[in-house]
A protein has these predicted regions:
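Short, glycine/charged-enriched secondary-structure capping and boundary segments
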Residues: 19-22, 65-68, 92-95, 120-124, ...
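Domain-level recognition of soluble alpha/beta enzyme cores
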Residues: 125-155, 159
Length: 167
């Protein structure tokens, strides 16, 4: 069995209309949600063998915070700039190419690619895949190359608005 954790980047800023979409940083809510989400990932015991992330600033910032909170080694973080704006087929192909000595992968990316990949793997329709969402899937495969339609089961789905701020 393999495990896959899909994480959508923390909320990003649209404050600078001149900034390229790839280079948008986190906004105030993203900066608040990210450490809380990273701590929950740790509390859930989701320690991946590798984090694969889009190279977009908001995704990379999210992945680096996760790696730091999970106390991963720098070589466990794999930045792939081409994952920015990738469709689910591209994400699937990247995952299918991963070495089989990795049993748990974490993929930090963007909507709608993550949404479509999650549905393809589990056939569970999520109402939405909000920013800072964590979707953990158990996969009925022994090798990453076997990743296919409906091979996964959702074990956990968590996002910031499920945890209202204390009054």
């Amino acid at each position: 069995m393999r495990k896959l954790t899909l994480i959508r980047h923390a909320k990003s800023s649209w404050a600078d209309p001149m900034l390229n979409d790839f280079d948008r940083p986190l906004n105030k809510r993203g900066e608040t949600d990210l450490p809380l989400m990273a701590r929950r990932v740790r509390e859930f015991g989701l320690f991946p063998d590798r984090i694969i992330t889009s190279g977009a600033l908001r995704a990379l910032t999210t992945a680096e915070a996760l790696a730091d909170t999970l106390e991963l080694n720098p070589d466990q973080l794999c930045e792939l700039p081409d994952l920015f704006e990738s469709c689910s087929e591209t994400l699937l192909h990247v995952l299918q190419q991963q070495p089989d000595h990795f049993h748990h992968l974490m993929l930090v990316g963007h909507s709608p690619g993550l949404d479509a990949l999650a549905y393809y793997l589990t056939h569970e329709a999520l109402k939405k895949f909000p920013t800072s969402a964590v979707l953990h899937i158990h996969l009925s495969i022994t090798r990453w190359s076997e990743l296919a339609d409906s091979c996964g089961t959702v074990v956990l789905f968590d996002y910031p608005k499920m945890h209202p701020a204390p009054l």
